């Protein structure tokens, strides 16, 4: 994880709406999907937010343990940052936390690509819950 950085659009220390249980959320910058009615449009830019070391992100996550049950990767598009997130995910799992990931890519697409990319395979293997497919406002649940 030494000297690796991630373009981060935002970070929530504690969230109850981005997966099951209290969790931290890493919002990455950059997305090519251009979903209609995207709820995080500003995060589509790969330059939005701040370049943060994976070490610093992990320290922030660790500061929330034992309160949190897991970490969610959202964005932007997490799968645009496969190499960085696969390294971060490995460290998160060593803390005993679960990982959720929201991606605009479909599970079918990921299945086709997974054997072509070692880091993708490693990342997907670390994810406990994958929420796939482009954002569709008609499927949004309002409580």
Positions of predicted regions on the chain:
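Short Fe-S-cluster ligation motifs
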Residues: 59-79
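Structured loop/turn residues at beta-strand edges in well-structured enzyme cores
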Residues: 33, 66, 125
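Flexible loop residues that form catalytic
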Residues: 43, 76, 135
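Classical nucleotidyltransferase
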Residues: 124, 128-143
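Canonical radical SAM enzyme core domain
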Residues: 45-58, 79-123, 129
